[in-house]
Amino acid sequence: MENIRFEVQLTILHVEGLWKNGLLRSLKPYLLISVDDDQFIKTNVASGTLRLSWGFTQKLTVSPQSIILLQLFDEKQKNETSDGFVGLGAAVVNSFLPFNNPKDDYKTRITLRSPSGSYRGSVVCLFKRSKFLPEELPADKSQICTDIIDDASGCAWETRIDEFGHVYYLKSPQLSVISAISHEKLENLTPKQLKEVFSQFLFNNQSKSSLKINLEYKVIKHLLEHYPLALSVRQQVAVEKGPLPAGWEMRLSEDYHVYFVDHSTKTTTWSDPRDNVVASDSVSENTDSIQQINDEYQRKIAYMYDRPEMAVNDAQLQLKVSRATTFEDAYDIISKLSVSDMKKKLLIRFRNEDGLDYGGVSREFFYILSHAIFNPGYSLFEYATDDNYGLQISPLSSVNPDFRSYFRFVGRVMGLAIYHRRYLDVQFVLPFYKRILQKPLCLEDVKDVDEVYYESLKWIKNNDVDESLCLNFSVEENRFGESVTVDLIPNGRNIAVNNQNKMNYLKALTEHKLVTSTEEQFNALKGGLNELIPDSVLQIFNENELDTLLNGKRDIDVQDWKRFTDYRSYTETDDIVIWFWELLSEWSPEKKAKLLQFATGTSRLPLSGFKDMHGSDGPRKFTIEKVGHISQLPKAHTCFNRLDIPPYNSKEELEQKLTIAIQETAGFGTE
């Protein structure tokens, strides 16, 4: 990545999920785009109503570390007092356009945030890379210090934020007034003082083109006026990597890009040397730490399943469901089972399929059922935010008159999965597990649910609160298009928030967001779970371990997979085996998970990975066997973690047949 800058063609396609108080709203939006506070572009107004589309295209020159900032404005909201600012978002180029990947076209979503949190959405962009533009960056062109000062020569030190979220300062004799003011001072400026600063800024930059200075003015204006918002955007692209190795220095180029100087070799590079140092120095330490975590978790698992209340009855519980109506069938059956029935050996049959359940069928049953239960379309659960796909209980689920029965059923399904050592395919927010373990929740837990909301609460905590904020002990909620005021305490809508009671206000808000808004639903779910798994068993785990117990491990390590794989009628040196592992290394995480689910019945793994995989008769490695004619598709034996692959003639043919198998086939048979 040394001395690399390249040209990209940015196409703004459309906006997704732009919400105002929970309702999709028709806007006349346009975007201001800036790259590293240098390139400023204004788009046309988007067309459409429910789907806001642009088709706007612009060429940009970027480096892997460049930060692209998008600001959204609404023409409809422009008036004498407002320029129609809606919100902003940012992304580091290398996070969605890796320079060393041969692919040239990348589609990405940049999340938009608004100061009030009332708007949510993302801008869908297409980046098309064209040519590289190598640049030499001499090491003596820029200087960095740790304070903002005016020296005797009249120069000032300009604040800059690098791609890691760190603040650095650039010495410049032509520094504008606005750049010489620290962020701490800006936070305390009144609107009138801000206006004076902006006016001075415009006066000092009269020589620039009117369009560019107007755009630059807007970018700076909204970053400064909405400091908590700008902070959250910077944190979105921040990556903390620790100190630089000995002999290295971080500097800024003339166009404000971060680069690194190795004084021992007198060379410069774009590459962060901490990436390699961290990786090499911490391998053995991390390995030991991970092994200790695995060992402790395995001891807890062994202890749990050795307890008398976790013993599986030798009698059989047979559940017969249809693939098309798995949720409905399972609800009708499981809701009526006694606790003693649920402790019998579980056998699943899919209607019109001959497959016998030696483990693989029940693994697939829980995989399919969890996708149905936790689908936000059923309104039992919802995504925490538009950019946080962790699930939480939906407060609006109580509109269903049978919601308690449904959540008791969900708790029973979770209990059955744990009791019979199966995995669900779901990702809850961390506070959900803490509630199950009866751990107290605090303000910091809000961050795991909604980081923007958390930053707003944190700002209230750390700053003076007065009447101008118009806060009281209530919240406004949207319930199916109707705005409803909910008191956080009795008569809360008539009690103003001030510096004396703001901590009580924050506590009440946290309690409402994480607990009381879904208390009845959670109690029903917890009751169903405790019918099979008592608290005395659950509470030996922490919240992260409980997530692993319920869902297994999500990350798939191809090298670990390869290390614990057996072969029948193939060897590691056969072309088909070599191609298989090459394909897995190239595939996306989603496609690898689909293959794992196809071959084993689940897309999840034990905490220690492939070495602890189980089949119908205990521990069983993943196996690749040479079976079938090249005209046939690969075949899976999920009960035995076995994949039958015919001896195809090329890597392309293997990929084509595997892709068809994992995407188009479903159902069990017998041999």
Curated annotation (Swiss-Prot):
* Entry GO terms, CC: cell cortex of cell tip; cell division site; cytoplasm; cytosol; membrane; nucleus
Membrane topology of the entry = Peripheral membrane protein
Q: Which reaction does it catalyse?
A: S-ubiquitinyl-[E2 ubiquitin-conjugating enzyme]-L-cysteine + [acceptor protein]-L-lysine = [E2 ubiquitin-conjugating enzyme]-L-cysteine + N(6)-ubiquitinyl-[acceptor protein]-L-lysine
- Spell out the CDD domains in the cross-references: C2_Smurf-like, HECTc, WW
One GO term under biological process is: protein ubiquitination
Q: Which Gene3D superfamilies match?
A: C2 domain (2.60.40.150), Hect, E3 ligase catalytic domain (3.30.2410.10), Hect, E3 ligase catalytic domains (3.90.1750.10)
- Tell me what effect the entry lists for residue 638 to A: Reduces ubiquitin transfer between ubc4 and pub2
Query: InterPro entries recorded for this chain?
Result: C2_dom, C2_domain_sf, E3_ub_ligase_SMURF1, E3_ubiq-protein_ligase, HECT_dom, Hect_E3_ubiquitin_ligase, WW_dom, WW_dom_sf
User: Which residues of this protein are catalytic?
Assistant: 639
Describe the location of the C2 domain by residue ranges.
Answer: 1-112
Subcellular compartments: Membrane; Cytoplasm
Positions of the HECT domain: 338-671
One annotated GO molecular function is: ubiquitin protein ligase activity
Keyword Cell membrane part of the UniProt annotation: no
Effect noted on mutating residue 627 to A: Reduces ubiquitin transfer between ubc4 and pub2
Q: Identify the enzyme class.
A: transferase
User: SUPFAM superfamilies from the xrefs?
Assistant: C2 domain (Calcium/lipid-binding domain, CaLB), Hect, E3 ligase catalytic domain, WW domain
Pathway(s): Protein modification; protein ubiquitination
Pfam assignment, any one: WW
| Assigned keywords, A-Z | Cytoplasm, Membrane, Transferase, Ubl conjugation pathway
Q: Does the keyword Disulfide bond apply?
A: no
Name the domain of life: Eukaryota
Kindly give any further remark recorded in the entry: A cysteine residue is required for ubiquitin-thioester formation.
Q: How does it assemble?
A: Interacts with the E2 ubiquitin-conjugating enzyme ubc4.
Protein purpose? E3 ubiquitin-protein ligase which accepts ubiquitin from an E2 ubiquitin-conjugating enzyme in the form of a thioester and then directly transfers the ubiquitin to targeted substrates.
Protein name as annotated:
E3 ubiquitin-protein ligase pub2
- Species this protein is from: Schizosaccharomyces pombe (strain 972 / ATCC 24843)
Name the lineage.
Eukaryota, Fungi, Dikarya, Ascomycota, Taphrinomycotina
Gene name, please?
Answer: pub2
